[in-house]
Amino acid sequence: EQFLSIIREIMSTFPSLLIVLEHITTCAAVEYIKQAPANVAATITVHHLSLTLDDVIGAELRPHHFCKPVAKCYGDREALRNVVRSGHPRFFLGTDSAPHLRGKKECSHGCAGIFTAPSTPALICEFFQGDVEKINRFANEFGAAFYHLSPTKAHITLERWDGSPNNTPRVRMDGPVEIFTGNDDGILPWRIIHDE
């Protein structure tokens, strides 16, 4: 939260600069953005909508949930979820995917980062309960509008399913990369059936 004072200094020096706080994780950051001028926004990752610090270092260490910024407490996660569900236009999706090999995560000096690229569409769809309008605003329109760009016309189609991404081809370099699914069973409730 100490970085917020630095953001205030930047805003004071460059009052018309577009400022985006990337991958916010705290209630304090949410409240700051809500009260900030229209040229200040924030991105939120799909995994920070799912995780708390307890999911990373609770009863056991979960290296595949370790990322930076680190997930925070339950109240912080709820603040992120609530502002995203509210449809506030200065909070939009910030994708962040780190496909570290299993051996680079499951070790005494593991890498920070979560592999979300294959699961982000499904996790966003589940978060919004399939509400296409809300998904499109959070993942497409709000960010484009903030940057004064046109939203993409491309679209994807997802369907509900009970399959596991772990049964589909995985990224391979020197070993497997764990796909983040937001649950312990490794199952994504949605899958892409059409990409355009």
Feature locations, PLM:
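His/Asp/Glu-enriched, well-ordered alpha-helical/loop segment
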Residues: 86-151
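Active-site microenvironment of metallo-dependent hydrolases
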Residues: 125, 129-196
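Short, glycine-/Ser/Thr-/acidic-enriched flexible segments
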Residues: 26, 47, 98-100, 163
